[in-house]
């Protein structure tokens, strides 16, 4: 047991009774992100947590590389938020990941995760860390003689173009 929760993509899709996102174009599971930020940053006020969730959920870089770099920095170092202390605005960092105790994080694996971008695609598996997609796994049928690693690699490269928003935090 590695501590990952498993869900089928349909179960968390828009319109499902257990939906975790409002639209197929959304790739960040905001409820999980918010819960993790609250758990990991109990010293920050509600408004700071709300600001951190908004910054991540609404971030739009000028390129996939820029977006990925900024999200990586936020995951590694924390999301900058402004809080008021003694009448003064101060910048703090809302930590996204518990780096010393992995079990304190929310790990989720979703199979058949539908995402709508330039096209609609459905990666075989997506791994989420505290609501952020951090890994995309493409599986191939070992009984299919034409299936190989290069086909899986090319499929993931196509995903970068077609559903690039899935790669911003990963």
Placement of each model-derived feature along the sequence:
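An alpha-helical interface "stripe"
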Residues: 1-170
